[in-house]
Amino acid sequence: MLVPLMEAVTDTCGGKAGALGALLRAGLPVPDGFVVPFAAYLDAVRDPDLARSAGESDDLDAARRMIEARPVRAAVIDALGRALDELGDPPVAVRSSAADEDTGQASAAGQHESFLAVHGVSEVADAVRACWASLFSPRAIDYRGACGRDGRPSDDPVMAVIVQRHLDAEVSGVMFTPAGPDGATEIEASWGLGPSVVGGTVTPDAYRVAEDGSVTRTVADKRTRLDRHGTQLVIRDVPTRARERPAIDDATATRLAELGKEIAAAFGGPQDIEWAIVDGRVWILQARPVTAALPPPSSPSTASDTPAATLTGTPGSRGTVTGTARIVRGPGDFARVHPGDILVCPFTDPAWTPLLRIAAGVVTETGGVLSHAAIVAREHAIPAVLGIPNATSRLHDDTVITIDGTIGTVTAANA
């Protein structure tokens, strides 16, 4: 009923699990685990009552609620218990692996649920069910719609779920391998667990490893970190002395780049790779095709060519657009966003994906170019400028601004 992660393939376990299985078979460092395959999901949603209700309704939110309300079958719970015992009953990460996730056409970055520090068969079963239900969250439905797909529980899409040992990472991050033979590996890194980097809640250190092995880096002010405390995730303040200390040294950046090249060669193309470091050892948490190119490296603007009212951040998604600034601090502000507005926000949570379909551009206070939100902005082909401190107070609602996501600037219309 369950599939060892080493044996996972895309056809039965989804793109994320299939890639991790391939990496394990190649001898690369991936945390051990297993997969709840498509068959278990299909068995759950083919329950006659659920399938009939879903088939009679176009309300996919109702489908999500029905899945959430259904207990996981006893046979699945028994299999989960045995598999967890074989791992030694550690805290685990429970992660989505949908059929259309982590493909070369669409990343679905951050669109489905994943859970860290889950412990015990009951909690794992609940997390598996939540991953299944997340196929029908508003953000996942909207993302599939933007990609020209839809689906009901009795039809398409389908979801597998990965269960792996949880890693208490000292440093985590993301890297994009080169798009061409002379390209550079781009790496972002910060303290603690990976959601801070992929979720854009911190501005990470950025490293660029050239083909000749030379490393350039930009060290950020990494104010917070995410860590496990028991079965809870806690956000901690980073000590002052560590905030502007590089999260990794140049030798580690070079080691990551070499590992990235090995993974890209195995899959035959540029890869978006999530990684973590525990006790000095690098682990690979995810590898998927790069779906949209990064903006080209930009040269710093000089005082003579930058208007006084221009704010400068990190280029996140190329292009230039002029529109009305809309300050968005949370879901309570969503209704105020109109088509063509430029979102100005502390960071962009994956739940905000529906806004990216109507927004003309995005400005954030934190986050890196390899974060989930930046990836989705590039897939939607809307300009994004990231990591402008205090952007939500320095810019104002209803003012006209121009953002250049290729060089990383935001300028008020009257500048």
Which residues are covered by each model-predicted region?
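N-terminal beta-alpha lobe that positions the nucleotide/phosphoryl donor
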Residues: 1-162, 170-171, 251, 264, ...
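Alpha-helix C-terminal capping segments
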Residues: 22-26, 177-182, 358, 374-381
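Conserved, mostly hydrophobic/aromatic
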Residues: 33, 274, 377
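Conserved metal-phosphate-binding beta-hairpin within the catalytic cores
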Residues: 110, 265-291
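A short, polar/charged loop-to-alpha-helix boundary motif
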Residues: 196-199, 291-302
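Acidic, glycine-rich flexible loop/linker segments
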Residues: 197, 289-292, 320-341, 346-415
